[in-house]
Every structure is written in structure tokens, then in C-alpha cells.
């Protein structure tokens, strides 16, 4: 069974299964233009989880409350045919990670629910026979994740050790004293991570909660981080991912391990399943419990440029085999099919994200869902049916159901927001870079686009660098197109989806082939008659901002630039961001290989910038620290280049507060309108 979205007309989604150029023709030609407020009104769909009786799919909806300047997540369920939708959790608290008990009686989820503002995340249960959610766990520091045992009587919990501050606060409370703040005491090689305080020795371990006697038993120990835990189908063991080398902070050598879930032994020695020196992750058991499929990186020296392959090993350990080496595309989220004859997975390929399937008997790979789309998370029922997330150029993520050779859209979460909007037409393009390399991309044209007219054009660059623009809904590009811009996006070298060599072309070579590729995208848009060469803008976030910095230090063709959460002076990031291991592998140590660090740093050509540049970032960003933006701003301001620095308080690498997200979109439009549109 193979379903290609390019040839299929979905039930419940009329005409959206046509090629991308035809999809655009189905848009509302008399609608209104998209605004930042519309983007905030869009709801994010998460999940799915299929009920054991196959009748319902649980999922989450994240909704923004503009007035409260916050967002919340609720759990819903939708019938398999999409006709009935039921909200399961109330709007007064956020809930996530819904999981059905295997016996079908309960739906578990995680929520920090309670009258106390400091309530910790716990597992709560909804009884399918009715009633309010009831708290199931009570862990002082809260839980990070959970999974039902196959017999529904136990629950695997991921719990992080209490921090020094939490222990001190407890001690003060017991003594009837007020807790005093403690200094951060750091002794780890890797001591930063975006979105969290300084890293200490608190580690996440595996516990099992037994509902019969309400006991909590710890299964894994030590100065190691454990994650991605999953039950063996007979409930006797748990597979998990952990880096248990002598110094986990100095490498990315995570392996698959298995620990017994039976008996009363206080300390258990996990069994090592994989021995690959690279990262092994995402373990999943075969239904007979004899094998474990997982994701492996076989060339760890290439860090994030290496391809993620599908692999399999004996559950007893050994017999490790890489299954998709010849495919040369990134694989994720493996799941055995019910008959154990195949493995499903998510497959990234050339601006598309497909549902792939590997036949364990023949080695053949097919794609049950493919085409001009981007799938997200998926879940499989014991019948073989699959529920999955899909996004399209004019469709933010919704849930679809694949059963009986029929792919059906079962949620329409954002129809009300989208129905009267006139969105940009999106065209898939391919062009040659300066050295003849073929590069793929997309062009978004304004809803009132007229062929023959040359439009002001914005080059938007994706983050990563190892990621890709795909056929999913692109909020930034749609918003700018609604303002009258042609928007050009591309997947330059360094991007994923085109093979390891394409990604690794950027290794220690930032700002060289990728610069040529994005400039070729602009030249293509000009040559095809879309773009006015005298009204060009450029911008991006994260690596998109970094490549923007290369662009403005190498060319004066752009009238305005926006660089968000970017780096500019690389050597200043040593010991400051959370990429210390990756920096060292790619560029060496700065006191030993100073030239390598300086060679690719935009800082070395910062005196050549003449483009008016808006600089943005989050104050608490430890992924790409705000000091980079501050240094860039300082240079531009000192040199008399028109610039502005916008810093969002209490924000890390991604901007989450709704008012800040709207502010960022508004500033994008205002800056480009002034410098590119000429208003």
C-alpha cells in the first residue's frame, strides 16, 4: 500500500492533494490578507495516540490567549472518521503527552495542576467511564515523562534528581527557616543548555510506579542521563538511551541499553545493546521482544552533518546492522509493524517528509505516505492503521488517518481561521549554484501577484544549518507575501534532505557554499521575472541569522537585513554557548586552531557591512547567546550603519511569549517596508 499525496484526493480535504502549483489555485481569491494576528490565532496540533479499540485518537491543541499573553495546551480526542471531536481537559490548566493504557480504561497525561503556583508535573488519569481527571503520581520534583506497562498495572517514569537548590529549600522548610539562594557550583565540562539553568550533576533516571502497592522503584543510577525509555512487550525489561562513557560531556556516544523491570534488586546493571562509537537512539522493540530497532550515526566525527540511519540489533545484545546506509537520507521515529516484518519510520527527503517502510525480508524501502507534504509525529495501532500529523503549504499541521488504503484528514483545527484568507501561491523551484550544484527552494508570491511585474523580494534563510525548508506551512513567508513581497527560500548546502555530502559541504566551511547557493536563489527569482533587483531584503533566525551575517559582509545587493539569534564572533562563543563539543570537533580548540575559528567568522569582514540591519535575540538565549547580537549591533552603530537592537526579556533561543512573537513579526514588516519596499 502506497499513498502519494500528489495523486490522492483526500476524503474530508477537497482538492488539497494536487501538485503544489495546483494547490495554490484552490485558494480563496476574494479573501482577506493574512496578518500577524491571524498567525497568533492558529492552533498547534500535537499527538496523535490511537486508542486500543481503534475508535479514538487522542491529541493536543496548543492555543494562544492574546489577552493573557500566554498559551495553554489541552487534550482532545477525535473519532477515527473525524466526525466527532471531544475536549478532554479543561482550559484552566495545560496538559500534554496523552497516552492510552493498553487495556483501554484510562488516558494518562502530564500536567502541573493544582492550586499551588509551584505545582510540579505529575501523571493524571482520565477514566473512560467518566469523571474528572485524578492525580496518579506524586513525585516531589515532578516527572519528565511516562509510559504504561503492557499490562497497564505499572508505569515507567522519567524523574530528574533534585537539584542542590531544591534540597536546600526542603531543608529550610523542615527547619522552619526561609531558604537562601545558593551559588551555582559547576564542575561539568558541558555546563550550559538553552532553556535551563547551569547544568549540575542532577540526572534523569528511570523509575517504575506499581499501582498495586503504590511503590516507586528506581531502576537506573549513576552520573548519566537516561532517556527514551520504552517497555519490552512482555513487560519484563525496559530499553533506553544513555551515554555511559567515562566522560559523557566529551562525546556523543549514546548507546541503547536494557534494564530489568522485575524483582526487588535495589541496583541493577543495565545490559548494553549497541557498541557503535556514534549516537544510537530512539529504541523500539519488535512485538516478539527479540529485536530492537533504533537510529544510529555511523560517522560521529561529522557531528550534526552525519546522516541518521535505521539500524537493528538483537535484544540480547550484538548483531548490530545498519539497514539504510545506501539510502543516504535522515531517518527518525522507527516502529515495527504488527507482524514484525517491516519497520515504519519518518523519512526526510528533498524538501519533503514521508512515512517510510523498510521490509526486513527483502531490504526494500517503500513510502506508504509520500509526495509534496511534511509528516510529523505518527502512531500505529495493532491493526496496522496509522494516525499521523501532516502539513502542507496552505495547511498548518493537522491529523490524518491511514487505514484500508485510505488517507483521511480527521481534524480541521484551523479551518475557521483560514477559510477567508487569501494566501500566497507557493512554487517549488530548482536552480544551479555558481559551481553547478543543483539547489532546491520555494517562491512565495503575493496573493495579488501579476506576472510580468517585478516585486520587492525577501530572501529568508532557514536555521540549523542542518535542516530544510519543506512543503509545510511557512508562517513567516506567508506573512511577508501578504505584505506584497515575493519571498524566496532555499535549501543551500549544509541543509539536510539531500544526502550526507550535501550537508557536510559546510563542515568548517560556513558562509562559503551556502552563501553562493542562497545568492543563486535570488538570481533565479530575478531571472524568472519575479523580483526587482533593486529592492531586495534578507533575513533569518538562528543559522538563518548567521548566514544573513555572511551575506551582508560579502555583498551590498540588499537594501535591508534582519538577523535574529545569530553569531558573528565565533571565538567569543567558546565557553559561552551550549555547543562546546561541536565547536571543538569542527574547528578545534581556539588557542590551538585560532586561524580556523577566525577564517569562517563574519567578524573578520564586519567592516564591509553597509546594509541597514535589524538585530534581534532573546536575553536568556544560551544556544546562540545575545552577546553575539550585542557585538554586531555595537560595530554597526559605531560605524554609522543604520541599525537597531531588539532584545526580548526572559526569552531563550525561540521566542514564545505571544506579544513578543507579534512584536517580532511587526518589526520584520516595518523594517522591510522602510528599507526594501521604500515606504
Residue ranges and their predicted role:
Residues 28-63, 67-69:
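Mature N-terminal segment immediately following signal peptide/propeptide cleavage
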Residues 67-72, 115-120, 197-202, 248-254, ...:
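Short, solvent-exposed loop/turn segments at conserved positions within beta-propeller repeat blades
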Residues 72-73, 160-209, 254, 307-310, ...:
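Predominantly five- to eight-bladed beta-propeller fold
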Residues 79-83, 127-131, 210-214, 260-265, ...:
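Short loop/turn segments that connect beta-strands within beta-propeller blades
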Residues 245-246, 299-300, 413-534, 541, ...:
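Cap/lid segment of the alpha/beta-hydrolase catalytic domain
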Residues 489-679:
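Active-site-proximal cap/loop segments of hydrolase catalytic domains
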Amino acid at each position: 500500500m502506497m499513498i502519494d499525496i500528489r495523486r490522492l484526493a483526500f476524503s474530508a480535504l477537497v482538492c488539497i492533494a494536487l501538485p503544489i502549483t495546483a494547490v495554490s489555485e484552490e485558494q480563496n481569491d476574494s479573501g482577506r490578507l493574512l496578518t500577524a494576528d491571524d498567525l497568533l490565532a492558529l492552533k498547534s496540533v500535537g499527538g496523535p495516540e490511537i486508542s486500543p479499540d481503534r475508535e479514538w485518537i487522542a491529541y493536543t491543541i496548543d492555543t494562544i490567549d492574546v489577552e493573557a499573553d500566554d498559551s495553554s495546551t489541552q487534550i482532545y480526542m477525535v473519532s477515527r472518521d473525524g466526525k466527532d471531536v471531544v475536549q478532554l481537559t479543561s482550559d484552566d490548566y495545560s496538559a500534554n503527552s496523552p497516552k492510552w493504557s493498553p487495556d483501554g480504561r484510562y488516558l494518562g497525561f502530564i500536567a502541573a495542576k493544582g492550586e499551588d503556583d509551584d505545582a510540579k508535573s505529575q501523571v493524571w488519569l482520565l477514566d473512560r467511564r467518566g469523571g474528572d481527571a485524578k492525580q496518579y503520581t506524586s513525585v516531589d520534583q515532578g516527572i519528565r515523562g511516562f509510559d504504561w506497562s503492557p499490562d497497564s498495572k505499572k508505569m515507567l517514569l522519567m524523574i530528574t534528581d533534585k537539584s542542590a537548590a531544591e534540597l536546600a529549600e526542603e531543608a529550610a522548610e523542615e527547619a522552619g527557616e526561609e531558604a537562601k539562594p545558593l551559588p551555582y557550583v559547576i564542575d561539568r565540562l558541558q555546563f550550559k543548555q538553552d532553556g535551563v539553568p547551569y547544568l549540575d550533576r542532577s540526572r534523569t533516571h528511570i523509575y517504575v510506579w506499581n499501582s498495586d502497592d503504590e511503590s516507586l522503584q528506581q531502576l537506573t543510577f549513576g552520573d548519566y542521563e537516561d532517556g527514551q525509555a520504552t517497555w519490552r512487550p512482555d513487560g519484563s525489561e525496559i530499553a533506553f538511551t544513555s551515554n555511559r562513557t567515562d566522560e559523557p560531556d566529551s562525546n556523543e556516544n549514546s548507546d541503547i541499553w536494557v534494564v530489568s523491570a522485575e524483582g526487588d534488586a535495589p541496583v541493577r546493571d543495565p545490559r548494553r545493546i549497541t557498541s557503535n562509537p556514534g549516537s544510537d537512539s530512539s529504541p523500539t522493540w519488535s512485538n516478539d521482544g527479540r529485536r530492537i530497532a533504533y537510529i544510529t550515526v555511523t560517522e560521529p566525527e561529522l557531528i550534526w552533518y552525519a546522516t541518521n540511519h535505521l539500524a537493528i540489533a538483537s535484544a540480547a545484545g550484538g548483531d548490530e546492522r545498519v539497514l539504510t546506509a545506501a539510502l543516504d537520507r535522515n531517518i527518525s521515529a522507527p516502529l515495527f509493524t504488527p507482524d514484525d516484518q517491516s519497520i515504519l519510520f519518518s523519512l526526510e527527503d528533498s524538501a519533503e517528509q514521508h512515512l517510510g517502510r523498510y521490509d526486513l525480508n527483502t531490504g526494500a524501502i517503500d513510502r506508504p505516505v509520500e509526495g509534496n507534504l511534511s509528516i510529523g509525529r505518527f502512531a500505529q495501532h495493532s491493526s496496522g492503521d496509522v494516525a499521523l500529523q501532516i502539513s502542507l503549504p496552505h495547511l498548518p499541521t493537522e491529523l490524518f488517518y491511514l487505514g484500508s488504503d485510505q488517507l483521511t484528514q480527521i481534524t480541521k483545527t484551523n479551518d475557521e481561521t483560514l477559510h477567508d484568507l487569501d494566501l500566497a501561491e507557493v512554487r517549488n523551484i530548482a536552480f544551479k549554484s555558481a559551481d553547478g550544484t543543483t539547489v532546491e527552494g520555494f517562491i512565495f508570491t503575493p496573493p495579488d501577484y501579476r506576472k510580468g511585474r517585478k516585486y520587492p523580494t525577501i530572501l529568508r534563510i532557514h536555521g540549523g544549518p542542518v535542516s530544510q525548508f519543506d512543503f509545510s506551512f511557512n508562517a513567516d513567508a506567508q506573512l511577508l507575501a501578504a505584505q506584497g513581497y515575493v519571498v524566496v527560500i532555499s535549501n543551500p548546502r549544509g541543509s539536510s534532505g539531500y544526502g550526507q555530502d550535501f550537508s557536510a559541504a559546510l563542515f568548517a566551511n560556513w558562509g562559503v557554499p551556502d552563501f553562493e547557493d542562497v545568492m543563486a536563489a535570488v538570481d533565479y527569482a530575478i531571472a524568472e521575472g519575479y523580483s526587482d533587483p533593486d529592492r531586495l531584503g534578507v533575513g533569518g533566525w538562528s543559522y538563518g541569522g548567521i548566514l544573513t551575517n555572511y551575506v551582508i559582509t560579502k555583498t551590498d545587493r540588499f537594501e535591508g537585513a534582519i538577523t535574529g539569534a545569530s553569531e558573528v564572533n565565533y571565538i567569543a562563543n567558546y565557553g559561552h554557548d551550549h555547543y562546546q563539543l561541536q565547536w571543538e570537533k569542527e574547528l578545534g580548540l581556539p588557542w590551538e586552531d585560532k586561524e580556523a575559528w577566525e577564517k569562517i567568522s563574519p567578524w573578520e569582514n564586519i567592516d564591509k557591512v553597509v546594509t541597514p540591519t535589524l538585530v534581534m535575540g532573546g536575553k536568556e538565549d544560551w544556544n546562540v547567546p545575545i552577546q553575539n547580537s550585542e557585538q554586531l549591533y555595537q560595530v554597526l552603530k559605531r560605524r554609522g550603519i543604520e541599525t537597531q537592537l531588539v532584545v526580548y526579556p526572559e526569552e531563550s533561543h525561540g521566542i514564545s511569549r505571544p506579544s513578543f512573537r507579534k512584536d517580532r513579526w511587526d518589526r520584520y514588516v516595518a523594517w522591510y517596508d522602510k528599507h526594501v519596499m521604500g515606504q
